[in-house]
Amino acid sequence: MMAGCGEIDHSINMLPTNRKANESCSNTAPSLTVPECAICLQTCVHPVSLPCKHVFCYLCVKGASWLGKRCALCRQEIPEDFLDKPTLLSPEELKAASRGNGEYAWYYEGRNGWWQYDERTSRELEDAFSKGKKNTEMLIAGFLYVADLENMVQYRRNEHGRRRKIKRDIIDIPKKGVAGLRLDCDANTVNLARESSADGADSVSAQSGASVQPLVSSVRPLTSVDGQLTSPATPSPDASTSLEDSFAHLQLSGDSIAERSHRGEGEEDHESPSSGRVPAPDTSIEETESDASSDSENVSSAVVAQHSLTQQRLLVSNANQTVSDRSDQSGTDRSVAGGGTVSVSVRSRRPDGQCTVTEV
């Protein structure tokens, strides 16, 4: 059995590096003071401290939060705004990373700007680029990404549809931040900058542009008789003339209605919307439909009158045919003209529908 001092020394060696940093040890190298991440099992890149005091990489916490808003070790709930306002262990390290160690750095495209890769991913990209590789794989927030160094795009290995541009540029170009962490600490900016993807791309400005849609596009264009499209906002100069003509046609007698019945339905439909009030450019669809419905009622009343007149003429024609058939059977020759027309009109109004033949 080991001595008590040996057990203590063994347990200290098994502690994470961040706990070794609290101990005063002369043979500990400065590089070992960087905490280790329990998610990616590597040294932390931009370490953040959760409310439960557990330390992880910022991107590792971000990827794990998609599965559940809880700590990966103790399962304590993570606040909703933690990714917007993370608690960095060393904010100076973020500023130093943005300045870089060399002349060039690697960036990926975001909305309204470029994000700089974290130091570890930048080293992997630079190493693959210097060796002339066509592509390389990167582990970001628990997802495997493929960097296409020929087309300068990145995408998830299991989802090729979502692509993002990447580039190799000088270190001093304007940038939004590093690995999803903004360089500016303005509270208003941070609240609006909710990052939605693992590689730190934001999607706030997309909602403001997509919500604005023109109202005029929802108005249906009018179709004229010759098949051309006319816009309600640009009426023809003869609109007032066609308005007077349409009402004049509606007030004609039965003969005029009979002539109207030979016209096509397309002409009636064309007169209804054009005979309404001339709409302004900002006229809504409801106003256009109400004007069209008022004219359609006038046209429908004329159609009903024409329908009743047609039925009366059909009854007269059937009665005339019945009289001529019976006159042939009795052997009496009659002419259709003369009193036949008068007798037919009387017989057609009888309720029983029977006709009696009176010889003259």
From Swiss-Prot:
EC number: 2.3.2.27
Zinc finger residue extent: RING-type: 37-75
Phosphoserine carried by residues: S290, S294
Gene (name only): RNF146
One GO location term (cellular component): plasma membrane
Entry remark concerning the domains of this protein: The WWE domain mediates non-covalent poly(ADP-ribose)-binding.
Catalysis: reaction(s): S-ubiquitinyl-[E2 ubiquitin-conjugating enzyme]-L-cysteine + [acceptor protein]-L-lysine = [E2 ubiquitin-conjugating enzyme]-L-cysteine + N(6)-ubiquitinyl-[acceptor protein]-L-lysine
Keywords: Cytoplasm, Isopeptide bond, Metal-binding, Nucleus, Phosphoprotein, Transferase, Ubl conjugation, Ubl conjugation pathway, Wnt signaling pathway, Zinc, Zinc-finger
Top enzyme category: transferase
Ranges annotated as biased composition (Low complexity): 295-305
Domain (WWE): residue spans on this chain: 92-168
Pathways involved: Protein modification; protein ubiquitination
Protein name as it appears in the record: E3 ubiquitin-protein ligase RNF146
Assembly and binders: Can form homooligomers. Interacts with PARsylated AXIN1, AXIN2, BLZF1, CASC3, H1-2, IPO7, LIG3, NCL, PARP1, XRCC1, XRCC5 and XRCC6. Interacts with DDB1, DHX15, IQGAP1, LRPPRC, PARP2, PRKDC, RUVBL2, TNKS1 and TNKS2. Binding often leads to interactor ubiquitination, in the presence of the appropriate E1 and E2 enzymes, and proteasomal degradation.
Species, as recorded: Macaca fascicularis (Crab-eating macaque)
Binding site for a glycoprotein: Y108, R111, W115, Y145, Q154, R164, K176
Gene Ontology terms describing biological process: positive regulation of canonical Wnt signaling pathway; protein autoubiquitination; protein K48-linked ubiquitination; ubiquitin-dependent protein catabolic process; Wnt signaling pathway
Main location: cytoplasm
Annotated region described as Disordered, given as residue ranges: 259-360
SUPFAM superfamilies given in the database record: RING/U-box, WWE domain
